[in-house]
Amino acid sequence: MLEIKGLTKKFGSKTVINDFSMTVADNEIMAIVGPSGAGKTTLLRCITGLERVNAGAFYWNGKQFDPVNPDKNDTIIGVVFQDYQLFPNLTVMGNITLAPTLVKKLGADEVEKTATALLERLGLGGKENLYPYQLSGGQKQRVAIVRALAMNPKILCYDEPTSALDPALRDEVAQIILDLKKQKMTQIVVTHDMDFAKNVADEIQQVEQIQ
């Protein structure tokens, strides 16, 4: 279970998130929704350690942790970015195996075996040697999901996973998220799309812009 207690984030004198608390149960899909400018992406960046908080604490199963300084051997949070952030000079396999080998110091054979299994699971078998420019938008997103899963996180977070996707791809993303839930993956989805949130989420947390 993930617990966030009293999270506050400021940029200079502007408070973007004020005393925010949230609990995400194991194997649950939590959607964070709200209008543009309400701080959804900033909240996700705090949860994933890309932004330092001004106040607040994070707990995983009752044990406090710091997303900014994670334990390299025990990944709690994984993230799929809105723009995927794949390395254009690396193949699909290279994108997926880079972090596990560099950060977790896992052996190349072990990492490639895991990556191959994940690619098959998400319908990307045979794409290992392609480069990002050779992939469709939906395929790039699935590679980004596989890359996050390869670090074996406890929780997988998504930043606006349906932005700029047509209805068919939105349904595909929803199915991937629901399939991962069946495999006991806890997930947090940041989205402006309430219909999508209702389709996938067990619980919806609404955030409003601070006046």
Spans of model-derived segments:
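Conserved ABC ATPase signature
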Residues: 131-135, 139
